[in-house]
A protein has these predicted regions:
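Amphipathic alpha-helical segments used for helix-helix packing
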Residues: 84-85, 98-122
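Helix-turn-helix
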Residues: 13, 20-55, 59
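Hydrophobic/aromatic-rich alpha-helical bundle segments in the mid-to-C-terminal region
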Residues: 119-125, 129, 143-195, 199-200
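N-terminal intrinsically disordered/low-complexity leader segments
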Residues: 1-9, 200
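Short coil/turn segments at alpha/beta junctions that flank glycine-rich nucleotide-binding fingerprints
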Residues: 24-28, 78, 100, 145
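Generic hydrophobic, amphipathic alpha-helix propensity
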Residues: 10-18, 35, 60-64, 68, ...
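Hydrophobic alpha-helical connector segments
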Residues: 59, 70-103, 154-161, 185
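Short alpha-helical scaffolding segments that buttress acidic/His motifs in well-ordered protein cores
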Residues: 56, 89-93, 107-111, 161, ...
Length: 200
């Protein structure tokens, strides 16, 4: 095993531990000492890889966002019509809400902390740019294939679709019973379908 591989393994162990601790205790209550103990490393080694708890939170959310981007790319690749794309948007959003609530809650923590931390603010800005770019590129390819014909420019449409799904996810976090209401998912599908337009 190379030194680089060993380093990556330690860093991943710390990130997994941070994800568990931050999820269970919240950002404010979780401590570096707890995260280091959970990862089975010293505080000194943790700080060798990550400068602060802020950076740990940001990197945990970044890892989740990378997975989100992969879901979005797959969504666009397998959609053959605007109807498909609207349905798949529901599938992706539902997958995140139901399969990875930790990512949802830690993302909210990250958004809150971004108002106080320049480091986290920079990370959040970069992550949202990554998400918008993925959606914009997918929309551009879908339009090129003739499966959608939106009435608004693709850049603003990408931001709008993300705003709608983010807003719903935030409401589901506050009121979990809403996520069990099928009408919410039907409304998301209908709204997305209307925004995407009819392909040729």
């Amino acid at each position: 095993m190379t030194a680089r591989a060993r380093s990556d393994e330690k860093a991943q162990a710390i990130l997994h531990a941070a994800r568990r601790c931050l999820s269970e205790r919240g950002y404010a209550a979780a401590t570096i000492a707890e995260i280091a103990a959970e990862a089975g490393v010293s505080r000194g080694l943790l700080h060798y890889y990550f400068r602060s708890k802020e950076e740990l939170l940001a990197q945990v959310v970044r890892a989740g966002t990378d997975g989100y981007v992969e879901l979005l790319e797959s969504m666009f690749a397998r959609s053959q019509s605007a109807d498909d794309l609207a349905r798949e948007l529901v599938v992706v959003t539902r997958t995140i809400v139901q399969s990875d609530p930790t990512f949802v809650s830690l993302s909210m923590e990250c958004w809150t902390l971004a108002h106080e931390s320049p480091l986290v603010a920079h990370e959040v800005e970069d992550l949202y740019r990554q998400l918008r770019d993925a959606v914009s590129q997918g929309l551009e390819e879908a339009e090129g294939r003739g499966i959608i014909r939106p009435a608004i420019p693709l850049g603003p449409l990408a931001a709008l679709l993300l705003a709608i799904t983010d807003g719903l996810v935030m409401q589901f976090l506050i009121h979990p019973e809403l996520a069990a209401d099928e009408r919410m998912w039907e409304a998301l599908e209908l709204g997305a379908r209307s925004l995407l337009g009819t392909g040729e």
